[in-house]
A protein has these predicted regions:
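Conserved ABC ATPase "signature" region
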Residues: 33-52
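Conserved ABC ATPase signature
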Residues: 56-61, 65
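A short, proline-enriched helix->beta-strand linker immediately N-terminal to the Walker B motif
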Residues: 76-80
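Helical segment within the ABC ATPase nucleotide-binding domain
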Residues: 97-110, 122
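A short, surface-exposed alpha-helical micro-motif characterized by mixed small hydrophobic
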Residues: 124-126
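Short, glycine/charged-rich "phosphate-handling" switch motifs in NTP-dependent
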Residues: 130, 142
Length: 216
């Protein structure tokens, strides 16, 4: 799974064709059977409106939806090891959490190992059981999550953990409200036909309430 799914997916082919190609190449199954398996994969990664999304192109999907497709491609042939290279960096914070939960759930469900590459210690702490710390391309510490965060041995690891703790505790949340948003909606029209009539909407944001305090 790559950092930027938009550049990893082919904009000239539908999601169905791209996942089917992997299944047919490696499993030697028919196109109809591949499509059936593709639908199952997309359900497993939490993509909604499968019959519609499977016929979509990558540019018609949101960042989170594209990353779900990439995860579906990653698990398509039942790997023992899934490599995820900064898979949430290009996503907003809310979608990041959803994708992380999805990856963790799939790891347990499919009983596979995950090599998760990240520079974000918060993400690593949420996901990993065992951690390798690298500096200048060399592994300087290899230990359990508990030891890395609560008993680091290498000086570089200590600096990373201390910096993370300072950043987390650097500012106290204030009581002053600096932004409030109520029932925010961002809908994109779906146009079809020669006259490009609006036949529906993609609800990117639907009735979101947000309050932001000083230092938050």
């Amino acid at each position: 799974i790559f950092q930027e799914p938009m550049s990893s997916l082919n904009p000239l082919h539908t999601i169905e064709k791209q996942i089917n190609e992997m299944l047919i190449t490696h499993s030697k199954i028919s196109y109809a059977d591949a499509t059936k398996k593709t639908k199952e994969l997309l359900i497993n990664v939490g993509l909604e409106s499968i019959s519609k999304r499977i016929k979509s192109y990558s540019y018609e999907l949101s960042g989170g939806q594209r990353q779900r497709v990439m995860i579906a491609m990653g698990i398509a042939n039942d790997p023992d090891l899934l490599i995820a290279d900064e898979p949430t960096t290009a996503l907003d914070v809310t979608v990041q959490l959803q994708i992380l939960k999805l990856i963790k759930n799939l790891q347990k469900k499919l009983n596979m190992a995950i090599l998760f590459i990240s520079h974000d210690l918060t993400v690593v702490k949420h996901l990993a059981d065992h951690i390798c710390i690298m500096k200048d391309g060399i592994i300087v510490e290899n230990n359990t999550k508990e030891n890395i965060f609560f008993n680091p041995q290498h000086e570089y690891t200590k600096k990373l953990v201390n910096f993370q703790n300072k950043k987390k505790n650097s500012k106290t949340l204030g009581s002053k409200k600096i932004l409030e948003v109520n029932k925010l909606k961002v809908w994109y029209p779906i146009k079809k036909g020669i006259l490009r009539r609006i036949v529906g909407h993609v609800k990117a944001v639907d009735s979101i309430n947000l309050t932001l305090f000083k230092n938050q």
